[in-house]
Every structure is written in structure tokens, then in C-alpha cells.
């Protein structure tokens, strides 16, 4: 499989991010558990072969993240039927300049909402990363980690594309200092039926 692999701390959000997003999708059911609002940031350095979202690789793609968009995200997230926010891309952890203030605001104003994020970093790589990435990680509930590996593609997997990726309970993992898999993981027929419906 081909993708880029950084040395610890090599890719810095403050050097790469242009403060841009590819898309914002409110009220969807595909990017994690429950009804979610999904923010797709611009820019990714991993460049996984077979990536379904190649259009997000450029840090100059999309549109600027604005205060107006943030207000819309907060208003949508405040709806009682919305479970939480999902961060995707692109690579969320290379866009900490826009995501850290947003996530801090959510934790302060809407603490009952959960936050999911996808990342190309593995948990083990993340533990060696820069303080901004670790701060963002500390405020996330669920992390889907690891590069997409086309050779391990599996449509039966819940919320991920290849079997090397994990759905990690971040808070339990940080407390126990070891990877703790999300306790609602449900790979198999039910996931396959969901994928077919999409």
C-alpha cells in the first residue's frame, strides 16, 4: 500500500493549514453514531491510495472557515435530535487552528454533544505528536484512526473503510493509557446493510 508517513511532529498544522473547509453537512446519519453534523476540512498529507475523498487533499481547496459558518454549526448542533459533531477531511489534526477553538466552544456551550473525528494518524503515532494535536484529541470522544489501506478494504466494517482502522474511545484510552475500542462496535451484517442503503 502506498501513503505518506510522517516523522513525529513533522507535519505542523500552523505551517500547512489555510483555514479552509471542503464542506459542512448538517443532519446526516453516516459519519458516526446518531444524527450528526459533519465538517470536512481541507488538506491532507497522507494521500492514501484509493482514498474516496481525493478532492480534500489540497490545503487550498474549498472555502474559508468563517465566523458565520461557526455560528451555523453551533445552531445546528444545538438541535435536541443532533447527537454530535464529526470532524473529517482532509485531515482534522492538520487543521487545529480552526478546530481547536470550535471544539473548545462546543465543550463549553454544548457539553452534552459528542465529537467524533477521523484521522490518518494511528493512535500510537498521535501519542508522539505536537501539543496542538494532543489538545484536540483530548476533547474528542471517538477517534477512527489509521490510514485507509485498499488491500484491507471491507464493506462489512462499521464507520471505516479498511480493517486496520479502529474506532477508539478516546477518553477511556487516555485514562487507561492504552487503546480502548468503542464498546458499541458492531461490524457485520448490520453494517453491510447500512452500506448498501447508502
Residue ranges and their predicted role:
Residues 1-40, 53-59, 179, 186-192:
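N-terminal [4Fe-4S]-dependent radical SAM core
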Residues 12, 16-22, 35, 53-117, ...:
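Conserved Radical SAM active-site core
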Residues 25, 119, 147, 171:
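Residues at the C-termini of beta-strands that transition into short coil/loop
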Residues 39, 91, 143:
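Conserved, mostly hydrophobic/aromatic
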Residues 43-47:
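Short pre-active-site segment immediately N-terminal to redox-active cysteine/selenocysteine motifs
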Residues 95-110, 153-198:
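P-loop/Walker A phosphate-binding loop and immediately adjacent motor/lid segment at beta-alpha junctions
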Residues 141-149:
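Non-cysteine beta-strand/loop elements that form the S-adenosyl-L-methionine
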Amino acid at each position: 500500500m502506498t501513503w505518506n508517513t510522517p516523522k513525529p511532529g513533522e507535519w505542523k498544522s500552523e505551517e500547512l493549514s489555510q483555514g479552509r473547509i471542503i464542506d459542512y453537512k448538517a443532519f446526516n446519519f453516516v459519519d458516526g453514531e446518531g444524527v450528526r453534523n459533519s465538517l470536512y476540512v481541507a488538506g491532507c498529507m497522507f494521500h492514501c491510495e484509493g482514498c474516496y475523498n481525493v478532492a480534500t487533499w489540497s490545503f487550498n481547496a474549498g472555502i474559508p472557515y468563517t465566523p458565520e459558518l461557526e455560528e451555523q454549526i453551533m445552531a445546528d448542533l444545538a438541535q435536541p435530535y443532533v447527537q454530535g459533531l464529526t470532524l473529517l477531511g482532509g485531515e482534522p489534526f492538520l487543521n487545529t487552528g480552526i478546530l481547536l477553538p470550535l471544539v473548545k466552544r462546543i465543550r463549553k456551550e454544548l457539553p452534552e454533544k459528542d465529537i467524533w473525528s477521523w484521522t490518518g494518524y494511528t493512535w500510537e503515532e498521535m501519542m508522539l505528536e505536537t501539543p496542538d494535536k494532543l489538545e484536540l484529541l483530548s476533547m474528542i470522544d471517538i477517534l477512527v484512526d489509521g490510514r485507509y489501506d485498499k488491500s484491507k478494504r471491507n464493506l462489512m466494517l462499521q464507520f471505516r473503510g479498511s480493517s486496520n482502522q479502529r474506532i477508539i474511545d478516546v477518553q477511556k484510552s487516555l485514562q487507561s493509557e492504552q487503546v480502548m475500542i468503542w464498546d458499541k462496535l458492531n461490524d457485520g451484517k448490520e453494517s453491510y446493510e447500512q452500506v448498501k442503503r447508502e
